[in-house]
């Protein structure tokens, strides 16, 4: 007999994280989406993986993820409702062997579907797994101050990254590779998925100008914390600019010393000699 899936740590983690994202104002209405790569051994504790509820076609070649299991937020679902009704707002899916569909094993009990950003998520998982086999989570949200910065700050990766590094001491330690930035693209398309996944090969944080941010990591906590750290730096930047602008900041020499102390190396060319 399988255990009750509502007791699974991965369901509890997802519910807690979506609630926090909503509480912080980063996922208004049905904004935002999360995909969580699960190990088969943890899935079979709670589900009979041979019992397919329905098969959902994909307009994307997911063959590189064939057979893999994911916990995915639903399309059009509100993060604020996940804790109270996880079976309606979440789904456990398995990618079909040919990569052209996903099998629903649990959830979406009202007939719902996985997030419309599923292609972008799957492309990002493929990209991250190619450089980090332990990557498990891809998270998209509308972090307020990072979003605002895309209207007022130079949109080059080096300049954007340097500003974030200079706002909070921990930023260089948390994302020494910097942030990636793609052009504005229509969401829910393969084009935005391809652009994001290309950046994901070198970055775990990808800014979608005038829209939001994508983050990736080995756990829910790591991914949430990555976005949270960058957003805090963007908030500090916003406050600093409203107080009259930067008078002094962390210097490049100090950033180098910080990297040496914590065993990280700033992305090549991002610090001045």
Swiss-Prot record:
Catalytic activity: L-rhamnulose 1-phosphate = (S)-lactaldehyde + dihydroxyacetone phosphate
Coiled coil: none
Gene3D superfamilies per record: Class II aldolase/adducin N-terminal domain
Keyword Methyltransferase appears in the UniProt entry: no
Record's keyword terms, sorted: Cytoplasm, Lyase, Metal-binding, Rhamnose metabolism, Zinc
GO annotation, biological process: pentose catabolic process; rhamnose catabolic process
Leading EC class: lyase
Sequence positions that bind Zn(2+): 140, 142, 211
One Pfam family here: Aldolase_II
Cofactor note: Binds 1 zinc ion per subunit.
Chief location: cytoplasm
Signal peptide residue numbers: none
UniProt GO MF annotations: metal ion binding; rhamnulose-1-phosphate aldolase activity
Cofactor(s) in the UniProt record: Zn(2+)
Annotated metabolic or biological route of this protein: Carbohydrate degradation; L-rhamnose degradation; glycerone phosphate from L-rhamnose: step 3/3
Subcellular location: Cytoplasm
Location of the active site: 117
Gene Ontology CC terms: cytosol
InterPro entries membership: Aldolase_class_II_sugar_metab, Aldolase_II/adducin_N, Aldolase_II/adducin_N_sf, Rhamnulose-1-P_Aldolase
Family: Belongs to the aldolase class II family. RhaD subfamily.
NCBIfam families hit by this protein: PRK03634.1 (NF002963), rhamnu_1P_ald (TIGR02624)
Name used for this protein in its record: Rhamnulose-1-phosphate aldolase
Organism: Listeria innocua serovar 6a (strain ATCC BAA-680 / CLIP 11262)
């Amino acid at each position: 007999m399988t255990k009750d899936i509502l007791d699974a740590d991965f369901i509890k983690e997802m519910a807690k994280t979506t609630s926090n994202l909503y509480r912080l104002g980063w996922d208004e209405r049905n904004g935002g989406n999360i995909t969580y790569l699960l190990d088969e051994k943890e899935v079979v504790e709670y589900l009979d993986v041979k019992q397919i509820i329905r098969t959902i076609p994909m307009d994307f070649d997911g063959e590189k993820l064939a057979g893999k299991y994911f916990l995915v937020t639903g399309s059009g679902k509100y993060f604020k409702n996940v804790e109270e009704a996880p079976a309606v707002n979440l789904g456990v899916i398995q990618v079909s062997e040919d990569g052209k569909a996903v099998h629903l094993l649990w959830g979406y009990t009202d007939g719902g579907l996985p997030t419309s950003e599923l292609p972008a998520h799957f492309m990002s998982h493929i990209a991250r797994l190619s450089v980090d086999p332990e990557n498990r989570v891809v998270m998209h949200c509308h972090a307020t101050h990072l979003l605002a910065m895309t209207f007022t700050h130079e949109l080059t990766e080096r300049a954007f990254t340097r500003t974030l590094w200079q706002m909070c001491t921990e930023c260089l330690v948390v994302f020494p590779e910097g942030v990636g930035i793609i052009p504005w693209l229509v969401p829910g398309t393969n084009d935005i998925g391809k652009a994001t996944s290309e950046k994901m090969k070198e970055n775990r944080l990808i800014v979608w100008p005038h829209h939001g941010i994508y983050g990736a990591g080995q756990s829910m906590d790591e991914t949430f914390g990555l976005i949270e750290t960058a957003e805090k730096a963007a908030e500090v930047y916003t406050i600093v600019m409203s107080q009259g602008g930067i008078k002094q900041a962390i210097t490049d020499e100090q950033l180098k010393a910080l990297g040496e102390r914590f065993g990280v190396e700033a992305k090549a060319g991002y610090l001045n000699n």
